From Swiss-Prot:
It comes from Staphylococcus epidermidis (strain ATCC 35984 / DSM 28319 / BCRC 17069 / CCUG 31568 / BM 3577 / RP62A). This is Uncharacterized sensor-like histidine kinase SERP2405. It is an enzyme of class 2 (transferase). GO terms for molecular function: ATP binding; phosphorelay sensor kinase activity. The chain crosses the membrane at residues 20-40, 222-242. One of its GO terms (cellular component) is plasma membrane. The keyword Phosphoprotein applies. The keyword Iron-sulfur does not apply. Probable member of the two-component regulatory system SERP2405/SERP2406. May activate SERP2406 by phosphorylation. Its main location: membrane. Residues 297-512 form the Histidine kinase domain. Its EC number is 2.7.13.3.
Length: 512
């Protein structure tokens, strides 16, 4: 066999030309790219944080403006000289303050008395005055002021991004800050270099919100990181150069032998084990080729068992996705019912616990049809509490059919889809009809809801064949994919609908 010395010389020259020089260029480009990307990312996050903060503060201002406007007529009959009216007024203001995502204080001041939730007597001159209203009560005219001490959003921006916030008036006087470099009442002068900032208008009084960042705080660390990366890359190139030279010198014959054995293994003509001429790390590859060839038959035999396990894992994964939006809405309903109707809230909690126990049961992914129908009835019962009994459920399933076994939670997505996409201003009637024919279960779910246009219906049908989690119709998509995993191509799901005439879903599955 020919010597590989010329190849080693060529490899040495190639490594020097194609590795050393590119590494140097990568360091230069990396330094420039790091700075450019850093500036771009910071500008983007500052813009995003400025917009989020502006939206939050304006929403709070709008909320109190709407609240005061709606209550002014009623407040004209309120006499704040009476303790009962005082207590009622305090509760109203505290409720509005506590509903906002910020630490707020109100100050209601008249000619002879005042009310506030600033029990710690904090200095309100260091807070941002969100809004101010003149309100006429029965006994006197009062001035209502709403102050903001801080918000979780601004704290998180300061903590996580190192960005500071200012609120200034039309004369650039600082009204609010969370940075020690500025103080309330001083004039704001934008730094000339090393700072990035963005400003947005807050209200009609020309107050502006400013979010800014000192780029000197992190640019030095970034440069140091690039220097370290450059040194590491240079060391790796040197090590790779030496290793490649030795491999070209010592392992050429063994590489060719390995290539020949790979070709023999592809054609299933590989004989008994033969070690390489030189003992090296390539011997691991040589051993692996023989081990792979010997285990090929065992691998083929285990494929079928592995596929079954994979299907079980996929089924369990889909079952664990218990409608987080439904659970969230139900918990909100319970929270609303607890002070109004504790007994109803207790009933909802019991129904929800039974549904969770049913959906999270891992002993088997198949259940009796009667259990599935009971689960659906509980689901609709909870939905009726949310929607004021606007859903009517009718089940037409013979007794012998209810003893059949189906996949757990195979019907619930159909009912959920009917409620979510079919409910309108009129009562929604959902009919479930189940029949058994020739070892197949035929399930029809019909609703008299708003239906779908032809184009919308076509999009829904196409969404059944999209990847899981890649569609807005997750319930039907999960159901379709799960049915294929569990029953193969024998499962069928057809959807028919007309605008303002309801929707019909026909579901056919083989019996387990």
């Amino acid at each position: 066999m020919k010597t590989y010395k010329p190849y080693r010389h060529q490899l040495r020259r190639s490594l020097f030309a194609s590795t050393i020089f590119p590494v140097f260029m990568v360091m230069i480009i990396g330094l420039i790219s790091f700075y450019a990307i850093y500036i771009w990312v910071e500008h983007r996050t500052i813009h995003q944080h400025t917009y989020q903060t502006q939206t939050e503060l304006q929403r709070i201002d709008k909320h109190f403006h709407t609240f005061v406007t709606q209550q002014q007529k009623q407040w004209r009959h309120v006499d704040l000289s009476h303790p009962t009216d005082i207590t009622k007024m305090k509760r109203q203001l505290l409720k509005q303050v506590h509903q906002q995502p910020a630490i707020l204080y109100y100050d209601l001041k008249g000619s002879s008395q005042s009310f506030t939730n600033n029990y710690e007597q904090l200095d309100t001159t260091k807070m941002y005055l969100i809004s101010k209203y003149r309100i006429d009560f029965k006994d006197d005219t009062y001035i209502l002021k709403i102050y903001m001490s801080s918000t979780p959003l601004l704290k998180n921006i300061k903590k996580n991004s190192g960005q500071s916030a200012l609120i200034v008036d039309s004369y650039d006087t600082v009204l609010y800050t969370n940075d020690d470099r500025f103080s309330i009442g001083q004039k704001y002068q934008p730094p000339q270099f090393g700072f990035m900032n963005e400003s947005l208008k807050l209200n009609s009084h020309h107050a502006h919100l400013i979010i800014y960042k000192d780029i000197h705080e992190t640019i030095e660390d970034g440069i140091a990181l690039l220097v370290v990366m450059g040194v590491v890359l240079i060391l790796l190139v040197i090590f790779g150069y030496i290793s490649a030279d030795r491999m070209a010198k010592r392992q050429s014959e063994d590489i060719e032998a390995i290539v020949r054995k790979i070709d023999d293994a592809k054609n299933r003509h590989l004989g008994s084990y033969e070690p390489l001429k030189k003992h090296s790390e390539l011997e691991e590859i040589n051993n692996y080729i023989y081990d792979l060839f010997e285990s090929n038959e065992q691998l083929i035999q285990s494929i079928e068992q592995t596929e079954r396990r994979l299907r079980d894992i996929q089924l369990k994964e889909i079952e664990r996705q218990f409608q987080p939006h439904f659970l969230f809405n139900t918990m909100q309903t319970i929270q609303y019912l607890i002070p109004l109707s504790p007994k109803v809230a207790q009933t909802v909690i019991q129904q929800l616990s039974q549904m969770l126990r049913y959906s999270l049961r891992t002993a088997s992914h198949t259940v009796k049809l009667a259990e599935e129908l009971s689960y659906i009835q509980q689901y609709v019962a909870i939905q009726n509490i949310r929607f004021d009994d606007m859903i009517q459920l009718y089940i037409d399933a013979p007794e012998d059919v209810q003893h059949q076994t189906i996949g757990k939670m195979m019907l619930q997505p159909l009912v959920e889809n009917a409620i979510k996409h079919g409910r309108g201003s009129e009562p929604l009637k959902i009919t479930i009809r189940i029949r058994l024919t020739k070892r197949k279960l035929h399930i029809l779910v019909h609703d008299n809801g708003i239906g779908m246009s032809p184009s919308h219906l076509e999009r829904v049908r196409q969404s059944l064949h999209h990847d899981v989690f890649d569609t807005t119709h997750l319930g039907l998509n999960h159901l379709h994919n799960r049915a294929i995993i569990q029953y193969g191509t024998y499962a069928r799901l057809h959807i028919f609908s007309r605008s303002h005439q309801g929707t019909l879903m026909c579901y056919q599955i083989p019996l387990v």
